[in-house]
Amino acid sequence: MDKLSVNHLCGYGLEVPDLKVASDFYTAFGLRASIAEDRLLMQTAHEGPSELIAIQGLEKRLHHLSFGIHASDMPKFEEHLKKIGSPTTASPQKGLREGLWFQDPWGTWINLTPTTVIQDPFKNLKVPRVDRHLWRELPKEIKPNRLGHMLMFTQDWEKVEAYYCLALGLKVSDRAAGKVSFMAGGSGVRDHHCFGLINSTHRGFQHSSFQVNSVDEIGLGAMQMQKAGFTDGFGIGRHALASNLFYYTRDPWGSWIEYYADMDKISDSWQAKDWNELPYVWPQWAPEFWGKEMNANHERK
């Protein structure tokens, strides 16, 4: 059981007060939308389970997390979760997602669904530039490749980190000491993180991040969102931890969505570190914005 691990974050669910508002926002971002009963199913260009399921609710709230596992690990996870006191149970809503369902000790629903391991959709980052006009070949519409990661606000930050490592086999890849824990799943070479925990007073959704191919696609995605009327955002920039390029847009409920590219990869030999001071790479963000806006948990306790 010591090597049992989820492979990656394959989806999440949000309760939202208006599915039409959600559809307009996420389709502007480049996701495909379809309606199923009282929920909105959103997918990237990647084939597989819906990366985002928006469910009709009274207000915006994090509804569930979904992680991909090997099909052969399903019975192993079921046994493992029972042993640690988090037995699997029925889905909170019929037909929501396939696989195993359980609640963590703080009440958040978690789904484990059998999927194939996600690979980067591009093999060569170096685009030949001899005798060609690159600008003429850039995409007219940005459609993200896949869901890369999401961050969740939580109370009991250290206990939650320990539980998610135990229950899901996630591995801490780096920490902003006392503030944020970045976590990776699976084995071999993979993204620096697929999930993260932000120290807060209670649970909540902070942001999700979707991969695109280049800095050009991030910039074009930012323009795409602004043209659609979603002008509250920041970037383009490069993070310190994970080193990825980014652009964030605020969603209609005060949380965030991100285009990202060019993230650090880690291997099984990677050693996590606690960082007490993190430099701003570029741009020079205002610390009060990062603290009061980006990390504001708007969900009720």
Indicate where each model-derived feature is located.
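Vicinal oxygen chelate
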Residues: 1, 8-17, 56-143, 146-155, 181-182, 229-301, ...
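Core segments of cupin and vicinal oxygen chelate
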Residues: 4-50, 98, 152-192
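Conserved active-site tyrosine of GNAT-family acetyltransferases
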Residues: 22-27, 81, 107, 160, ...
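Conserved short beta-strand elements that form part of the metal-binding/catalytic scaffold
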Residues: 31-63, 71, 109-116, 171-206, ...
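Non-heme Fe(II) oxygenase catalytic core, chiefly the N-lobe of the double-stranded beta-helix
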Residues: 116, 131-165, 169
